[in-house]
Amino acid sequence: MNVNDLRNKTKAELKKELLELLKEQFNLRMQKGGGEAPRPHLFKRVRRDIARVKTLLGEKERNNE
């Protein structure tokens, strides 16, 4: 996920993206708990993408955008 692409999105789009990422993270955890072995690198990627989106949402809140 590219930060520059995320910066061009509105707050509503970022919130939608965050919700999708949280669902993806939940599904990965369920797969791991269910015995399936998902690719471990996906946990790190999704966690960092969530952090990026939350950071940009905070920036937009502070700038009243």
From Swiss-Prot:
The keyword rRNA-binding does not apply. Disulfide bonds: none annotated. The gene is rpmC. One of its GO terms (molecular function) is structural constituent of ribosome. HAMAP family: Ribosomal_uL29. Belongs to the universal ribosomal protein uL29 family. One of its GO terms (cellular component) is cytosolic large ribosomal subunit. This is Large ribosomal subunit protein uL29. Keywords: Ribonucleoprotein, Ribosomal protein. It comes from the Bacteria. GO terms for biological process: translation.
